[in-house]
Amino acid sequence: MQIYKVGGAVRDRLLGRPVTDIDWVVVGASSDEMLARGYRPVGADFPVFLHPQSGEEYALARTERKSGRGYGGFTFHASPEVTLEEDLTRRDLTINAMAEDEQGRVIDPYGGQADLEARLLRHVSPAFAEDPLRVLRVARFAARYAGLGFRIAAETLALMRQLAESGELQALTPERSWKEISRALMEPNPEVFIQVLHDCGALAELIPEVEALFGVPQPAAHHPEIDTGVHVLSVLQQCARHRQPLSVRWACLLHDLGKGLTSEADWPRHIAHEARGVPLIDAVNQRFRVPRDCQELARLVGEYHTHAHRALELRPNTLLELLQSFDVYRRPQRFEEFVAASEMDARGRLGLEQRDYPQAAYLLGAAQAARAVSVKPLVEKGLKGAELGEALKRARLAALKAYKEERGKA
């Protein structure tokens, strides 16, 4: 029985990056032997065990064979006879197909160290094309390591195109797709993830609503980058630079979907694109069974982001309606995330990344002014029901009028 450290832990150590999760592979052992040593079984599809002391995962060396469509269409074989090299050959990229023995020696049968030096993301074998999930994984690794100069090997990108064209991506479960997408959006360069999916044809299969934005022009006066797809990439880049949470990044990815529906005759203007985009945002959210907080914010950002850009011009009653749309009195964080997403949208324009966005402070101040209105004096007057609601609305409107006047004097 031999135990090897494998995958990301080996890769990240060689890159000089922090090692967080450690995976182990066990060669020459059976499930019975693992149980006898106190390991606890946790694998549903293949033999994976938790170490009795550390709780880390130890998997028996295994091979896999394509037996159906999609990510789950594989038959696994684990036995003491499976070698380390056979186990490593089933992995996606050469940089993930390295192992380290108990003496710290690196076992590298597929050139992972050379590809690390060359900053190359390259597949291990033609079997790469059997698993559609690997398209998303490689795009995610590209987003993670773009800052280190990594690029995808041409032959690997060709296999990714082959997978996209095969229709296999449609066999991925919504949950598995969302897991990869959400992880990728939180990488240092999330825009690279979307760019790679666009380049290999996978974006058209997975999120055609975003794919449709590439090549759609916007007014150069407001968007020097012109191309709407390029704008979305720039907005995601700003999200990463400003360390925005997943909900904001997801909303920013989808905020301009309505522009993909504008007829060419109306280009480069996109009148009412916000309202047109809402059904598309809903469809994408449902397709991937996106968590509720991300769904809600994406929908609201899509519908109201131009309100944020025009915040300084909004009348107090329009501003009050905006705050009520976000239920800002009970859910202030959602409004704060909306403001953040709108600012990322404004900054995601070529040459305007550093421009001030006074709308952010203005909107947050307006929310604070409206939330500061207390219902207590109105209740003490004996108001209740609809009458109380109307009185509270008038008080909040008065507070916003005073706020706007005060800001106008500043």
UniProtKB/Swiss-Prot annotation:
InterPro entries, per database record: CCA_bact, HD/PDEase_dom, HD_domain, NT_sf, PolA_pol_head_dom, PolyA_RNA-bd, tRNA_CCA-adding_enzyme
Binding site residues for Mg(2+): D21, D23
Cofactor (UniProt): Mg(2+); Ni(2+)
User: Which residues does the annotation say bind ATP?
Assistant: G8, R11, R91, R137, R140
Swiss-Prot/TrEMBL GO biological process terms: RNA repair; tRNA 3'-terminal CCA addition
Residues engaged in binding CTP: G8, R11, R91, R137, R140
Q: State the Gene Ontology terms under molecular function.
A: ATP binding; CCA tRNA nucleotidyltransferase activity; cyclic-nucleotide phosphodiesterase activity; magnesium ion binding; phosphatase activity; tRNA binding
Keywords tagged on the record = ATP-binding, Hydrolase, Magnesium, Metal-binding, Multifunctional enzyme, Nickel, Nucleotide-binding, Nucleotidyltransferase, RNA repair, RNA-binding, Transferase, tRNA processing
Signal peptide residues are none
The cross-references to SUPFAM superfamilies, in alphabetical order and at most eight, read: Nucleotidyltransferase, Poly A polymerase C-terminal region-like
Domain of life per record: Bacteria
Q: Kindly state what the record says about how the cofactor is bound.
A: Magnesium is required for nucleotidyltransferase activity.
Entry's EC annotation: 2.7.7.72, 3.1.3.-, 3.1.4.-
Q: Which residues form the HD domain?
A: 228-329
The record's Pfam families line, in alphabetical order, gives:
HD, PolyA_pol, PolyA_pol_RNAbd
Q: Which cysteines bridge via disulfide bonds?
A: none
The chemistry this enzyme catalyses reads: a tRNA precursor + 2 CTP + ATP = a tRNA with a 3' CCA end + 3 diphosphate; a tRNA with a 3' CCA end + 2 CTP + ATP = a tRNA with a 3' CCACCA end + 3 diphosphate
Q: What else is known?
A: A single active site specifically recognizes both ATP and CTP and is responsible for their addition.
Domain topic, free-text comment: Comprises two domains: an N-terminal domain containing the nucleotidyltransferase activity and a C-terminal HD domain associated with both phosphodiesterase and phosphatase activities.
Q: Which HAMAP family match?
A: CCA_bact_type1, CCA_bact_type2
Q: How does it assemble?
A: Monomer. Can also form homodimers and oligomers.
Q: What does this protein do?
A: Catalyzes the addition and repair of the essential 3'-terminal CCA sequence in tRNAs without using a nucleic acid template. Adds these three nucleotides in the order of C, C, and A to the tRNA nucleotide-73, using CTP and ATP as substrates and producing inorganic pyrophosphate. tRNA 3'-terminal CCA addition is required both for tRNA processing and repair. Also involved in tRNA surveillance by mediating tandem CCA addition to generate a CCACCA at the 3' terminus of unstable tRNAs. While stable tRNAs receive only 3'-terminal CCA, unstable tRNAs are marked with CCACCA and rapidly degraded.
Give the family per the record: Belongs to the tRNA nucleotidyltransferase/poly(A) polymerase family. Bacterial CCA-adding enzyme type 1 subfamily.
Q: What name goes with this protein?
A: Multifunctional CCA protein
Specify the species. Pseudomonas aeruginosa (strain UCBPP-PA14)
Which gene holds the coding sequence for this protein?
cca
